[in-house]
């Protein structure tokens, strides 16, 4: 009810300042009686995926709560799962500002944040304090100053630390804002990374006596051949799930709009059709051998249904949440 007014005020601010302001308010509410201000009840629509039981199929995509500061307040809004991160072994400030832009007419966002986060140890402390009753995913990446050839070490460091606290772990090899990162999606580099991650998962499973599934997050900007190769690698290495998709470098759908020439990844409605097409193609290739978490431009019940019809078992929102507010969560979960 009140979100249009809140949005109008927030959209007067620079996007990153609006984000920081919102998170300051959410942190003040978290764990207090005032948390009811952001709480809403949504129907329970259980889904079993990656060996986990989700209370509903709608999650928050990584990138909004990078450091796990507002898990409880966001959880109170009705998400079945929340993915925090992307987090890296060491804290890093990310790219220079401004680095986040609203494409208001297209209901899209361009970001070149660059994995700004306070580091994996800080994230874990925040996760320990949270009481979220849903599934918590932790999205991990590599530090900007770690050479790509040594990138897998950063993923293994993060895995080692987050494993006891994660419902699932997401491997981000598809952000366009860390130089060279997307090269880890291809050929031998991907096989080498997935083999190391699977070995680490086996070791941690034995050490902690619990199995934490691993999902790999891929880009939308892949050729047919690359998509087929990735699907093959994921199956061969027994990866538990795939998150499709991250942001796009393609600007064809926002030509002529304000900020369309800004560098970074484009998300929101302009990504909707492309991400759904990647999910559909991936689903045909995987033949149910591992589940797909669908993300990219979901801003309505119809868009959510399209992702699931294309082959997604679970779905996530981010930009649609910014443009439509918490009401979108209730709407999707109720009518999906």
Curated annotation (Swiss-Prot):
The keyword Magnesium does not apply. GO terms for molecular function: dihydroorotate dehydrogenase (quinone) activity. Signal peptide: none annotated. PROSITE patterns: DHODEHASE_1 (PS00911), DHODEHASE_2 (PS00912). It is a peripheral membrane protein. Pathway: Pyrimidine metabolism; UMP biosynthesis via de novo pathway; orotate from (S)-dihydroorotate (quinone route): step 1/1. Keywords: Cell membrane, Flavoprotein, FMN, Membrane, Oxidoreductase, Pyrimidine biosynthesis. Its cofactor is FMN. Belongs to the dihydroorotate dehydrogenase family. Type 2 subfamily. Binds 1 FMN per subunit. Catalyzes the conversion of dihydroorotate to orotate with quinone as electron acceptor. It is found in: Cell membrane. Gene3D superfamilies: Aldolase class I. It comes from the Bacteria. One of its GO terms (cellular component) is plasma membrane. InterPro entries: Aldolase_TIM (IPR013785), DHO_dehydrogenase (IPR050074), Dihydroorotate_DH_1_2 (IPR012135), Dihydroorotate_DH_2 (IPR005719), Dihydroorotate_DH_cat (IPR005720), Dihydroorotate_DH_CS (IPR001295). CDD domains: DHOD_2_like (cd04738). Its main location: membrane. FMN binds at residues 62-66, 86, 139, 172, 217, 245, 268, 297, 318-319. Pfam families: DHO_dh. This is Dihydroorotate dehydrogenase (quinone). Its EC number is 1.3.5.2. NCBIfam families: PRK05286.1-1, PRK05286.1-2, PRK05286.1-4, PRK05286.2-5, pyrD_sub2. One of its GO terms (biological process) is 'de novo' pyrimidine nucleobase biosynthetic process. The gene is pyrD.
